[in-house]
């Protein structure tokens, strides 16, 4: 009888931990990266806002620029890449190098204009 209770309590504890872990995981972590691009509610205003960005606050543009930095970090796995890429509201050499490396040439001008819109 005590063995049954012990197994039962371990099973309940495991289920409780699974429930807590699944409820605290962000929706973006469970979905592919492209799935969250169209949903504005996946990013809060505070998570996208950078005080150095004094231009137009456009979530879609900020998300697109941030994605370049995230992808660049995933390729190079250097800790400073993600932060340096976003510094000065994406108007820096690291962002330009990431853009050159990751994006097709026909998208470069579009991203340069986005940096100008959200930047200074």
UniProtKB/Swiss-Prot annotation:
Coiled coil: none annotated. The modification Valine amide is found at residue 118. This is Crustacean hyperglycemic hormones 1. Disulfide bonds join 53-89, 69-85, 72-98. Its main location: secreted. Keywords: Amidation, Carbohydrate metabolism, Cleavage on pair of basic residues, Disulfide bond, Glucose metabolism, Hormone, Neuropeptide, Secreted, Signal. SUPFAM superfamilies: Crustacean CHH/MIH/GIH neurohormone. Belongs to the arthropod CHH/MIH/GIH/VIH hormone family. It is found in: Secreted. Residues 1-27 form the signal peptide. It comes from the Eukaryota. GO terms for biological process: circadian rhythm; glucose metabolic process; neuropeptide signaling pathway. Hormone found in the sinus gland of isopods and decapods which controls the blood sugar level. Has a secretagogue action over the amylase released from the midgut gland. May act as a stress hormone and may be involved in the control of molting and reproduction. Gene3D superfamilies: Crustacean CHH/MIH/GIH neurohormone. One of its GO terms (cellular component) is extracellular region. Pfam families: Crust_neurohorm. The keyword Electron transport does not apply. InterPro entries: Crust_neurhormone_CS (IPR018251), Crust_neurohorm (IPR031098), Crust_neurohorm_sf (IPR035957), Hyperglycemic (IPR001166), Hyperglycemic1 (IPR000346). One of its GO terms (molecular function) is neuropeptide hormone activity.
């Amino acid at each position: 009888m005590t063995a049954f209770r012990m197994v039962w309590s371990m099973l309940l504890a495991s289920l409780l931990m699974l429930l807590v872990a699944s409820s605290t995981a962000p929706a973006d972590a469970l979905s592919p990266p492209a799935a969250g691009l169209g949903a504005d509610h996946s990013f809060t205003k505070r998570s996208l806002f950078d005080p150095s960005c004094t231009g137009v606050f456009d979530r879609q543009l900020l998300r697109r620029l941030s994605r370049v930095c995230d992808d660049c970090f995933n390729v190079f796995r250097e800790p400073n890449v993600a932060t340096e890429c976003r510094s000065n509201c994406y108007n820096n050499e690291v962002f330009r190098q990431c853009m050159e490396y990751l994006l097709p040439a026909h998208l470069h001008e579009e991203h340069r204009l986005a940096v100008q819109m959200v930047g200074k």
